[in-house]
Amino acid sequence: IAFLDDEAKQDPLPNLVVCPTSLVYNWEDEIKRFAPNLRYLIVSGNVAARKELIHQLSDYQVIITSYPLLRKDISYYQDVQFNHCFLDEAQYIKNPSSLNAKTVKLLRAKTRYALTGTPMENSLDELWSIFDFVMPGMLLSHYKFRETYEIPIIKDENKAVKKKLIKRIK
């Protein structure tokens, strides 16, 4: 939040926070507490109300919405250029085939951040999906990543990496 407060002074573009529905108002509370000067907007309500709010994005420094509402409203967000985009609880995009993952990758932001305490639970696909949001293409296409890294690790062709992976999963 301190970072957002500082950035808002330097760049007029809005910043986007996408989080689970249960955390939307936590973000509001934290902004009020630590950066009361920030102009923030919570995008919620019915379709008409959200559409109206989204048309006002440029009046705010921080926009907060949830994964489910972003999925419903992505057509309104696609033309908006954000300064920074933060995914809170980024494990919500761990499945690269999920609507959440596909939707957030349509957003336009100068920089993207994934906030998570659980980057990977079951497979390297999960890590790839989060990295592909933050740095698109850095870990190759999903197919190439699987062929180059995931399958050899699963087949035990890279014992050193597998050891670290097992330690992380436990």
Enumerate the language-model features and the residues they cover.
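ASCE P-loop NTPase motor core, strongest for the SF2 helicase catalytic module
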Residues: 1-157, 164-170
